[in-house]
Amino acid sequence: MTRDLRLVPVAVGTWAVALACVLWPVLTGFAAIGSWCAAGAALACAFVTRRGALTAVACAAAAIAASSVWFALPARDAAADALDGRVTAVVVTVTTKVEPTIGGVRFSGSAQIDGATARVSVRLTGGEAPDGLDLGARVSVTGGGEPTDPGESAAVIVFARSAEVVRRPPHVFGLASALRHGFVDEVIRGLPDPGGGLLPGLSVGETSAVSDELDAQMKASSLSHLTAVSGSNCSLVVGLAYGACALCGLGRRTRIVVATAVLAGFVVLVTPEASVIRAAAMSAIGMFALLLGRRGAGIAVLALAVTVLVIADPWISTSFGFLLSASATGALLLLAEPLARGLGRWMPRALALGIAVPLSAQLVCGPIIVLFAPEVALYGVVANMIAGPGAPLATVLGLVACLAQPVPPLALGAAALAWLPSAWIAQTAETFAALPAARLGWSQGWLGFTLLTLVGAACVIVACRLRPRWLRRVATTALAVLVGTGTGMVTLSGVAGPLTAPRDWSIALCDVGQGDAILLRSAGHTAIVDTGPDVRALETCLSRLGVDDIDVAFLTHFDADHVTGVPALAGRAHTIIHGPASEPGELAD
């Protein structure tokens, strides 16, 4: 099968230029002018030689992305200067999900500052969010501002202790907010956890009911993409809408219009996360191609969607969520079929395809994940094979329950049915997270990225029997050594390790590198003082000592070598007591 990869260099080049411009703003002018000059030269050559038109398109796309950053910088700088270190009132139009934090909420939006529109991130502390604070609302916040680092989507962070909703979400935003909150507060109330807590995320993107313990289990089993609505849900909803219109005998144009409208409503309902935006752009481009009577190749549609989104918002190029979403989609489009053919030599076709889909995503996304979380979910492929089929059922039935709220019996019945696959996914996560060495430690940073990329390449070479033969032999040998070494390490750390730990300890000092993590145990109760800077090291220490339940955690102060390991306490610590924050951002984050 041939694939049209011509637009891939365009997307990669545009992404690279946008990323460089937002991380190093001083380069923006040079990048914009240079890209425009290159585009002009390539276009002139194309007219003369009838070749190189794609090069001109790639240079023009990069030039537009760089120019977009260039034109946005003055407003961002003005907003940062106006709010830096000052306590002032800012009216913000909410453009993202409102997420809970310790002692408050956080959200982002656009604001008029000194006559210019800039993106602002708000950390609201000191109480619950005011009623009506949701996507599309306009809220007045009072607090101190702090400029962000280059590459951050927002130009400035406002640390606020008070907020007033001056306009509730209007029109379709208000309807979506009412449906979303009604679903969480009324429809699924009473459904047993953890399935009941996971269902809102699978259906409408509302993750507030997901416990820390379940969140940690989903990450450990490589199922975190099922915690909330992902890009695949967009494709599912659009496909169902288009198919329903076809069954009703509607024409192609009507089907496309209805499917596109349903897509827009779904994005508003679940709030525009990075993976949802990517999938929505791909679906919209696919609908447009269908309207023109053309079939869009999957990888070409992905490349075009990435290019358009990066041009529209160059700061999305720094989003790990967007990178993971695009990478996973590309892996499914490029690797799943060859892997399925290769695995099909040893197993039935259906089983080979079932393994190839999560394996391809894991091979591509794994190296990216170790850049910020140096660990590998050892059972991720198997967990996804088992839990994956439940996600579409939970999504569709959950959406039916959400939209059927005016008819309570129907809504409650659909929610009860949706709970079954949701509970199945949660139970799968719990089971695999509890297995020995569920998260295998890996090298951090670019070294870990390179090593895991080589491992993934070796897997593809062996499974797909790529030539030449000597390359397959090298890859096979490398994988055999890796599997043997990994098995030995898992045996030593997962089985022999806990046997060497003392059982009657009262005070234990975890080896977390620079910093402290001190465990205290008395009368059946356990406490920890500080967490150190290394999440993985603390998790290893807690697992080795058999500490699954911590009554109280004390954080003496907010230096990185004392609190960076806090995520290791997720699902373990019941209470956290901390010292005073020297800066407002420490407590807000």
Model feature map: region roles:
Residues 1-78, 278:
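N-terminal leader/targeting segments
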Residues 331-437:
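Alpha-helical transmembrane segments of multi-pass integral membrane proteins
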Residues 69-87, 494-499:
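Short boundary/loop segments of OB/S1/cold-shock single-stranded nucleic-acid-binding domains
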Residues 2-8, 12-19, 151-279, 287, ...:
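Aromatic-rich juxtamembrane segments at the membrane interface
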Residues 211-381, 444-499, 580:
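Hydrophobic alpha-helical transmembrane segments in multi-pass membrane proteins
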Residues 2, 89, 115, 125-142, ...:
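Non-globular, low-confidence helical/coil segments that flank catalytic cores
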Residues 93-181:
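OB-fold single-stranded nucleic acid-binding module
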